[in-house]
Every structure is written in structure tokens, then in C-alpha cells.
Amino acid sequence: MFFNPYLSGARKPPNLVAKRSVAKTFLEIVPRGAMHDGQSGLIKHKTGRGAIMFYRDIKHVLENDMAWPCPLPAPPPSIEAFARRLMGPLKFHTYDQVDGVLTHDTQECLSPRYRHHITPSGNVLRFFGATEQGHSICVNVFGQRSYFYCEYADGDLLRDLLASVSDLVSEPRMAYALTITPVQKMSIYGYGTSPIPNLFRVSISNWSMAKKIGEYLLENGIPVYEIRVDPLTRLVIDKKMTTFGWCCVHRYEWRTHKSSTCDFEIDCDVADIMAVSDDTSWPVYRCLSFDIECMSASGGFPAAEQTDDIVIQISCVCYNTGGTGCEENTVFGTSGLHLFTIGSCAPLAGVDVYEFPSEYEMLLGFLIFFQRYSPCFVTGYNINSFDFKYILTRLEFVYKLSPGPYSKLPAQGRFSMYSPLKKFVTTTTTKVFISGTVVIDMYPVCMAKTSSPNYKLNTMAELYLKQQKEDMSYKDIPVKFISGCEGRAQVGKYCVQDAVLVKDLFNTINFHYEAGAIARLARIPMRRVIFDGQQIRIYTSLLDECACRDFIMPNHKGADNSSEPTDVSYQGATVFEPEVGYYSDPVVVFDFASLYPSIIMAHNLCYSTFVAPGGESPPESDVLTVELESGLSYRFVKNTVRNSVLSELLTKWVSQRRAVRETMRSCHDPVKRMLLDKEQLALKVTCNAFYGFTGVVNGMMPCLPIAASITRIGRDMLMRTSQFVEENFAEPCFLHNFFNREDYSGDPVAVKVIYGDTDSVFVCYRGVTAAALIERGPSLAHYITQCLFVDPIKLEFEKVFGSLMMICKKRYIGKIVGETELSMKGVDLVRKTSCEFVKNVTRDIIQLLFDDPEVSRAAVQLSRLTLDELKMQGVPPGFGRVIQRLSQARDELYTSRARVEELVLSSVLSKDVSLYKQSNLPHIAVIKRLAARSEELPVVGDRVFYVLTAPVDGRSSGVRNYEIAEDPTYVREHGVPIHADKYFDQVIKSVTNVLSPVFPPQTLRKDKFLLGILPHRIYLEPSFLPYCVKASEHC
């Protein structure tokens, strides 16, 4: 069919940005207090006056093409002037990419040179970035086909099949260009030396149609490969391009009628773009941090779906990131601080304040501002699940205004949010997509980067910035807002403060540099690094390696489908139960460096080396067989037959990380050093993700034989290490080779491995000083490595515990030699669910055990007593200090001297309240009580805090926690008494968990034993106190 690209006036299309206009009629919602100070309620009516705003008392009509009134940086040069400065190819840095589909009748002003790529329809890949001169640019790349592989008997028959399938897939359906080519490729899944028979590459010009057709073939049992690989991934792999870094375009044409809002826009062919691989520097990019304040008509916490729950203020902070630090600091506005508010507002120092008559006009003004400023990165705190969600919901449901045209692609852009309704939904699964802008919510970033009892902005500001925010209750915000312009200024100051704090967090944590490094390494867009987890990183990297080796990657029906049954299970790497007890002799800890990656490399494990049942089978001498404890066995060819793709990829990245770290040592430029550090961190994180990629049954390409073999080999390595240590480390010859006479403590030398878990070995070394073990530790680790393992597996010396309490598997407390703080794992002190009171009591008792020699000796003595001996001799005297601390804690609880703040418990709200099937959970009960009182409600991902209160009916037992759980603020403000029995029971359990190794071995109920050695006391109700006298008055 012939397509004339110039029909319908496509030669000179209109300017897509300037053509749009703002609706003159809209719903006006205004708080009464914005017009009449102090009055509550809303004014709502339709108006046709047109949208306006006021800036410095000057009225401005809101139009999409309006000049923004605040002070602005100098505009970019004209296309002609800029083009004259360029000599040769155009170099630009890309940070974001968007794929799309254009048809032959597109309204975009496209040169005839590129029109054949979209006839009848074709992919366009838009690379957003910045030029070397710092100007924003959009590079439209044409000619990248979508393709996948398909097994079929005949190419002509396959073409007929695809033609019929094209009419069966879901709407919208479009015409496309199709090419079918026979190819010689092998599947990476399973060892084999023969290409896949009757294999064709199906190349389709339209990604939307290619995806639908591929999925249809897969669902109908036709063998297909790589059907979910999008055209952007095809380009970066086929061309060895980058998704985050510097690129070069050799031949291109300037767009005079742009489809984007960037300073400049060019079109090019896919053959004319390439990456500049050596340069990892950043240009200057624009960033925006924002925050919103809302007001509920009901007085409760606002809900966006409620028409009367409006946004009243929006704060924005404009700033730059990247660059070398030598660039001129351009400011958008007076100082980069902006406040959008309904109603008049008193001036705020250094803040550009925009006043709007209604919510609609304020939201519209924010969207126009957003597009004028055109940020490359936007950040905030919980903006994915609240701020963006709130604004987008208001625009869609209340005002019927599409925000897409306010992205960097006014005609085809997206400005949307996606919240999948799954069983376990957290804030990190809420995705915000803005064409040309990368969204980095600092709330999930902080949750991933640190362990904290809560992740409120104030807590993170204290942790990272050593700052405290001036807090304002959501209940106070409406009161101040409607009080007058001064009150609105107070709310505005609070709103701006939050956006500034997030900007400082953004620049302190520097997650954007880390995400950029991962994007460059894994060849995926930066937004996918942020939102899509580890699987896509490994999949794309593996796809890249396959392309170099004529391998292709298979697809499976659904996430659960793999070549192995999903009920295949394998045991983790914990080797043996620990020798529980208190150790006063030194305990040496050895760790395997990068255990799982090194196992893959050392043993040539891979999809491509796995000998599948019924497949090609080389001689047994060329095969590694891994026997599982279940009786199953898996076989892999050795590297003499075929090198593992996973191994080669890991080897390359490990070497690359070593080189980067070496470069860091001699780098004195702080910016370059920070970029290098993020690069080596990206390499480390991605290397460690390989094991999870193969072991997740519902992952993108699971292979349980690989995952099970890795864990089995890891278990065997720990067992061999344990056996080797116990057989050799106490032998006279060994001791003579490694230790001198002064290294011995005087006790008989005895060596015992007391624990082995995943990648660590704990060795109790009696008779040798801790100082000697620290000095000789690296040599001991090197000796084990040489004797037992092959490269690159390496055992490393980590630390020496001077004393250690081994409680049970994955739980221990110890004091590392040379450090003052205790090292803990798995105990209540490091659990976020425990209250501070319990932690403090437990911590005090642990400190007594490790710091007080008398208590330590008493603990060892107690652990060696039988129950009969204990009845005769009593508890060792030194243990009395532990009993005294427990008695003190009991007194504080039963006499109401414990502070409410110390008694707060918490649980994570992991999904929406409506999705919980159990109603008898304390944190859910608290949320329901908060809702009944119209209090501020936590969002998904938050920790919900509560206190256990005394039951109103006076019951002391049989009370469930959810019946007495209450909000801490409510308890404090209303003086609600606490449930002392519940809290002291937690104290006893926590201390028992820590001290149980020192209790007599025959003790069955260790918590009962601990309660039994405490002195008995009776606590009277407060009403009896007037009738009591002090003991001293009887004397």
C-alpha cells in the first residue's frame, strides 16, 4: 500500500505546545476563610471568568503559553545560533528515555528522511538529556524495530499466521511493517551445541503490536523467545548504547516545530547514534522538590476523592544537580523557593508567592509552572503515594483535567500514577510516570538505606542532616490557614520547609547518582532502576551477553512456568545449629567474600551449562554433578567444555569494580570520587543479585537447578571449613607455624566451630590471645582458602569477639575486640517492633553481663549448675545485679513511673486496611480508632504506633492486645493508664531470650525460671495509697 506522508498538511504542522488553551469555565472551590478571615466551610460554584493568579499583587491570566512572571534564567540561543557553534557531531547526555509509536499521518513535523520508518506505523525512541553547553534536548530516534524469535515450520506459513493473529489481538490495532528472517541461534537455557531448528526473527515496526502478537503466540503454545524486550532495550543492546550517559549523534536534523518542551529537539536514524562510553560525568540537571498541604472539610485527614478535601498550598524548591561544581549557578525565581497558595498570603523572605482564587487555578498554575521549569528530576517525601496521587486524583475526578500535556511531551506525554492492587502493596510499588522527568521519592529511598523505628521526615532529617523540622499538626493547618494572610504564611513556611529538607536529603544521600550508575551498568532506564527491582537489571544484562554469543532467552507462559516444577525446594545455607552458650574465650569469625557470585564463577554454573534431563550430555569427566540432600542431582558442564555466561559476566564486573576502587584511591576530586563510589556500589549490588534472579520461582527467568546448586555448594564449603578447622587448628605443627610463645593465654589450646551460617564461620579459639588472633586472622583465612577452595572463592578474616553470647540460630550478642559497642543480631534490641522500655531494660542487663566481671562469672557459674545444685546453693551472688534491675523495671511499670514514649509498640501497615482479613491486629484496631476520631491516618508502608492500655473493665488476664491498643498521643493527652502486666511479660520474655544460654540446661520454662528468682511484691491500687505509711514511720 502507498502512503503519502504529506496528506492532511503534515509538512508544516502547528506548534503543538502553543496550540493548547486553558478552559474558561471550571468548578471554583474556595475555603471561606480565604475570603473572610476565620470563617470555616467552602464556597463552590461554576465560573466562566477564566483562570487567574496574582504575583506581587499583579494579576496574571493563566495560559499554557504564558510567560512565567518570576525572575528566570537567560533563555537558550536560537536553533540557528546554536547550530552554528557546533562543529561535527552533536554530543549530549541522556538521563531518561520514552518509547512511542507514530503513524504515517502524524501531526509531528518530520523530515522525509525519517518518514519511511513510521509508514504505516513505527517506533520512535525519545532520548531526553542535556548538551555539553547545558541546554535541554530531546533526540528522536527512528528506525529501531521491535523483534522477537519464533520456532515455526516455514517462514511463509509464519507470515500468514501473523497476519491472522494481527486481527485477533486486542484493540487498538494498527498496520505495521513486517520482516521475517531465518536465523541460527541457540537457547541459553540448557547445554547444547546445535542451533534451534526452524527459528525465525520476527521484526515488527510497531512495538505495541509486536508485544500483543508475541503474547498471543506464547499463550497458544507456539515457542517464542524474547517477546517482552522493548525497542529501547533492543537499541541499547544492539548498538551498545547507554541509558544514562553521554551519547553522540553523527547525522541529524533540527526540529523547528518541536514535539517536546526542551530547548532543542533533533531527529536521527538509529544508525547515527552511539554512546561515548568512557565519560561518566554528569551535566547540570534541573531538580524540583515539592510538598503539598491539604484541608478536609470534615476536620479529619483529607481524602483526594472527596470533593471538599482540597489542596490549599504547594511548595516547590528549584535547584540543580550534577556538573563539576564550576558552573554558573542559575536560579529559577528569586531564590529557587516557590509557594502556591489559595487566597492572599503575607510575604515570606526569599520565597516567590503565587496567590490563586481557587484550588483549580492553583493546580493549573502548578502544572504550568512545572512545565515552564521543566525539571529532569522531581523529588519529595512520600510523593508517590500521597502528593502526586492526591494532585492527580483531584485533577482527574474533580476537575477532569488531563496532566499529560504538562509533561515534556505535550501531545503524547504521560503524567500518571499506577498503583497495582496486589496482596502486599507498599509505597515502593506506586509508580509515577512523567515523560521526560524521573521521579525519585525519598521516602522509599530512606526506608531502603537505613534502619529506623520510623521513617518520618523529621526522623530522617535528624539522622542525615542533624536538623529538626518545625512541626505543625494537620489539625492546626486548617485553623491557621483560614485565620488570615499571616496564618497562611505560617502554613506556607512550614510547607516550604519540608520541600527544602527533602532537597537536602536528596543531595546528602545522592541516590540519584547510584541509580544512574546502575542504569548505565544494567542498560535499563533510570526509572526502571527506581521502580522495577533487581530482576530487570539481571535480565537485561544477561540479554546483552547473549547477543554477543548467538544465544537467545526463552519465554514461559506466566510467571510460574519454568522448566522445573515449582514444588522443587532446596535447603538454605545454614549448616548446623549453633553451640548455644556464653563464651568468654575469643571467637574468630571468618566470612566468604561474595559467596554466591564466587560459587557461580568457580563452578561454571549457568543456564548455558546446565545439562537438562533429556538434552545433550557430554562425557561425565566434563560434568560437575551437584547432589542435593533430597536425592535430586543437577549437572553442569565444566569450563573446559563451555564457559558460563553468568560467570563471564560476573568476572567482568568484579574486575571492573576492582579497577574502579583502585582509581578511587588516587582520585582527589570530590565529585569524581563520589561518582566512582556510586559506580562501584552499583557493581556490587548488581553482582549480588544474580542468585536471587535464578532462585525466584515467579521471576523473569527462574532456574531452580542453579539456585539449589549454589546453596548446596555453599553448605558443603561451610562444612569442609568447619571440619578442616577442628582437625588442624589445634595441632602442634599448625600452632608452631602460625603462633609464637607469647601468643598463648595459658589455658590448654582447644578449637571448636560453634556456628556456621550462610557465609560465616564462628570459631571458638581457647588458649590463644585475642590480639594474636586479630594479627594472624588474615593468614589463617588465606591458609584455609589455599587448602580447600579454587579461585575466585576466598575466605576472609572478619573480626574477633572477646566474649559472645550465642542464643540460637541467627541470634547472638558479642563484644568485638577493640570496639566499645556490642554487636547484636536477631535480638529484641535491634527489632523495630519492641518498645524502648523493654529495649532499655534488656540493654542494661546485657551491659552488666559483658561489662561487669562479677556478673559474667556468675553467669558462667549459673550455666554449669544443675537444678538440684541451684536449689541447694541458690543463685550465684553476682547475678543479684540482674535481679535488681528487673525488680526496678517492675516497680516503674506497676507504679506508673514509665513514660508513655518508652512504651510505644509498632507494626508496619503493609497493605490497605481493607485488604486485611484479620481484624484482631493491634495496629489495625488503632487505625480504626483514629478513623473514628477523624485523626490523621497512616499510609501503606508506615509504621503504626500504639500503646497497650489497662482494660476499662478491670480484667488483668485474658485481654487481647487489639482490644487495648491505643494511639500514644491519645494515651498521653488523656492520661490513660497502661497495662503493666503486658509490658512486664514482654520484659521477662526479652530478657529470657537473651539470658537463656546461661540458665541451667535442664530448665524447661526459662521465663518461669526467671520470674521464680525475682523477689515477690504486691502493688496496691492508687485508691489504697492514702491508708499506707512508709516503713520508716513504724520505727
Curated annotation (Swiss-Prot):
Enzyme Commission no: 2.7.7.7
**Quick one: a GO cellular component term?**
host cell nucleus
The principal location of this protein is host cell
Biological processes annotated in GO: DNA-templated DNA replication; viral DNA genome replication
> Is Nucleotidyltransferase included in the keywords of this UniProt record?
yes
Q: Does the keyword Hydrolase apply?
A: no
Q: Name one Pfam family in it.
A: DNA_pol_B
The protein's location, in the record's own words, is:
Host nucleus
Name the catalysed reactions. DNA(n) + a 2'-deoxyribonucleoside 5'-triphosphate = DNA(n+1) + diphosphate
Q: Which family does it belong to?
A: Belongs to the DNA polymerase type-B family.
Name the UniProt record assigns to this protein: DNA polymerase catalytic subunit
The top of its lineage is: Viruses, Duplodnaviria, Heunggongvirae, Peploviricota, Herviviricetes
Q: Which gene encodes it?
A: UL54
